[in-house]
Amino acid sequence: MIAKKLVVLLALCAVANANPAQQTPPTTPSADPSDPRVAVAARIPGARVDELRATAIPGIYELTRGSEIVYVTADGKYALTGDLVELATNNNLTEEHRRELRVKAISAFPETEMLVFGPKDPKYTVTVFTDVDCPYCRKLHSQIAEYNRLGIRVRYLLYPRTGPNTTSWTKAEQVMCSADRNAALTRAKLGEELKTKPCADNPVAKSYALGQDFALEGTPAIVMADGEMLPGYVPPDVLAQHLKDGK
């Protein structure tokens, strides 16, 4: 996990040398040279920084990209990885913010660009990053009726783990370009060949980018309504109990 966060941090810095036209500017510091954000911005000019804010620790700032979080010193010289825990309450402040960021990002993703399988009156809704060719994603989907029976509404976001210009990516595009997307997903997960041609107007790149922002390390990845993320396959009854306990 530490190595993953360092990669994310290095990626933030590397953006400065990438295509400037596609960069998202960092949080704008004030003109006051005593503002610590000036030093941080100077260390990573042009990097994609979604948010830079002070923490409860003097001189330590929180830097976010997607739902990934690292900490930097006020002078911008040092970076810290790991979770910030408030010992008095045992609250994981980093994870709390990650969850907020995930909820915000998923809320902004149109449900019309997801694949939704759910009962008429669901008790819970989860968002699942899935790969057509992932064995455990296929196992999860083979039990979709049981998830639904337990009151769980599943919203899929396609995340081809192999990335663009691969067979899994093409299959994902074929699913999203089908007249009946849900049926196409089920057929694809059963290993059936889809005849649909990929279309230009599909959300696969968008859902993949969201998964990248969430620093997914595999699929399936199940995101709860409160932003908690469970990596890997979770059986229907176990997920239902987890959701019930979290209410």
Where are these regions (language model features)?
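Sec-exported extracytoplasmic/periplasmic mature domains
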Residues: 41, 45, 139, 145, ...
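Active-site-proximal beta-strand/loop segments in catalytic clefts of secreted hydrolases
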Residues: 129-132, 157-160, 188, 225, ...
